[in-house]
Amino acid sequence: MSRNRLHLTVAAVIYYQGRFLLVQERDKLSGREVLNQPAGHMEEDEDLLSAVCREVYEETGLTLLPSAWLGISQLKASNGHTYVRVNFLFEPDQLPAAFQPQDPDILALHWLDKSQLLAQKLPPRSQLVLDAIDLCLAGTRLPLSLIQPLC
C-alpha cells in the first residue's frame, strides 16, 4: 500500500478581456504536452502570495500582483498523491507586450477563452485548471486579506 503524499501548490488565473493566460508544458508523469495556469509548489521560506507571484514570474516573465483569492481546490491524482491548490486571480490592466518565461519547462504561452481551451488538441493538465477558470467566470472574488501569514 503506497502512502499518500500531500502537495501544497499555488496557481495564478491570469484573466484579461475574457481570456486566460495558459502555459504549455510537458506533464512529468505522462510525458504529454498540456495546458496549465502558471502554478507550482510553495517553497519552505514563502507565504502563499509570494509563492504565486514567483510562479507567475518564472513561468511568464511577468511581474504582477493578485487582485483576489479564488479559493482552494483539491485533487487526488492517479499516482496516489493529493494536491491542494490555492488559486489566485490576476487581472492586468493591459495586455503584456511580451513574455519571457524564466522556466525552461514552459514551451509556449496562450491567451484562450474557455471554449478555445476546450477545443484545443492540448488538454488541460488536470480538472483543477478548469475548476479555477469556472471560479473566475462565476464571479468568485475573495479578499486577499483572508490570507494571513502565520508569523
Regions found by a protein language model. Give the residues of each.
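Conserved N-terminal beta-strand and adjoining loop/helix that marks the start
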Residues: 1-21, 38-41, 72
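Residue-level preference for beta-strand/loop junctions
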Residues: 4-6, 31, 82-84
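Conserved beta-strand residues within beta-sheet cores
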Residues: 9-11, 63-66
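Conserved Nudix-box catalytic region and its N-terminal flanking loop in Nudix hydrolases
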Residues: 16-58
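Short, solvent-exposed loop/turn segments at secondary-structure junctions
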Residues: 30-31, 73-77
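Unchanged
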Residues: 42-65, 75-126, 149-151
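Conserved S-adenosyl-L-methionine
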Residues: 67-71
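Charged phosphate-binding loop/patch that engages nucleotide di/tri-phosphates or the phosphate backbone
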Residues: 130-151
